[in-house]
Amino acid sequence: MADSIHYELQYLDLMRRIWVDGDERVDRTGVGTRSLFGETMRFSLKDDAIPLLTTKRVYWKTALRELLWFLTGDTNIRPLVAQGVKIWTDWPLEKYRKATGEAISATDFEARIVADADFAAKWGDLGPVYGHQWVNWPRYEPAGGGLFRRADHGYNQIAALIDSLKNNPGSRRHIFTGWNVADLDRMALPPCHMTYQFHVRSDGGLSCLLFQRSCDLGLGFAFNIFEAALLTRMVAEQCGLYAHEVVWTGGDVHLYLNHAELVEQQLARVPEGKPRLRILRRPPSIFEYRFEDFVVEDYAPQAHISAPVAV
């Protein structure tokens, strides 16, 4: 996209096209959606640019905490909730309510998750979701007699990616994915932003292509694109490269029918400003970044727009 055209206009155009021309269907949640299939957007990361939406406030600190949590390989919501991050609560809460019949509020459930480690261990785990697959993809080793057993330590796709980019930058195999077919049924939610491919330009620029099988354009996308850009910046820094671009491709890109007010408000707004992301410290590895290492500047978004989450 030309530098003179605001990066967010392509997002608003996609939102408008989905709302006007999208195929209306009943979805898994029962809410109903309008969707288009197979859409692509490109976002420059040059000069510290970061694709934060400006037509509504994006709580980028929450997204940052989520990405750092992914990189730990943890799958329990307890460390997130302890930091005030509640974006994953709905799934274990629904499971708890169905299993026990207790009409517990989200606030009380989260308080118990933080206060009681045993309760969190039983009810706060999401299954082998994103981070587990990223850094601990299951491996199997011979157990004799033609049998195999699960190895004690899984395969760290992120560490392998960094090594590959450093030692073989021209490779076309710089890929990691969270889509482990054998584990899908044990996940609270199968990965939406599922496969990442990286590309090193001849001038040392690093680009990331994210394939997202399912995209809630009204709510989830803002976090998805920010985290993809943030991860690209972190990977580039670790590999001595500069961040060039994020290319986003969505499979089923949809708007929920109960997001009409969100769509109307957001399409009435004009994007403005060019936020920047600065990384204050380069740790020895990508797994050692801390929350305080990141600063977003020149971000003056318009007012927050609330909308219900479809579980």
Curated annotation (Swiss-Prot):
It comes from the Bacteria. Catalyzes the reductive methylation of 2'-deoxyuridine-5'-monophosphate (dUMP) to 2'-deoxythymidine-5'-monophosphate (dTMP) while utilizing 5,10-methylenetetrahydrofolate (mTHF) as the methyl donor and reductant in the reaction, yielding dihydrofolate (DHF) as a by-product. This enzymatic reaction provides an intracellular de novo source of dTMP, an essential precursor for DNA biosynthesis. It catalyses: dUMP + (6R)-5,10-methylene-5,6,7,8-tetrahydrofolate = 7,8-dihydrofolate + dTMP. This is Thymidylate synthase. It is found in: Cytoplasm. GO terms for molecular function: thymidylate synthase activity. Belongs to the thymidylate synthase family. Bacterial-type ThyA subfamily. Pathway: Pyrimidine metabolism; dTTP biosynthesis. DUMP binds at residues 28, 172-173, 213-216, 224, 254-256. Keywords: Cytoplasm, Methyltransferase, Nucleotide biosynthesis, Transferase. (6R)-5,10-methylene-5,6,7,8-tetrahydrofolate binds at residues 216, 310. Gene3D superfamilies: Thymidylate synthase/dCMP hydroxymethylase domain (3.30.572.10). InterPro entries: Thymidate_synth/dCMP_Mease, Thymidate_synth/dCMP_Mease_dom, Thymidate_synth/dCMP_Mease_sf, Thymidylate_synthase, Thymidylate_synthase_AS. Its main location: cytoplasm. Its EC number is 2.1.1.45. Homodimer. GO terms for biological process: dTMP biosynthetic process; dTTP biosynthetic process; methylation.
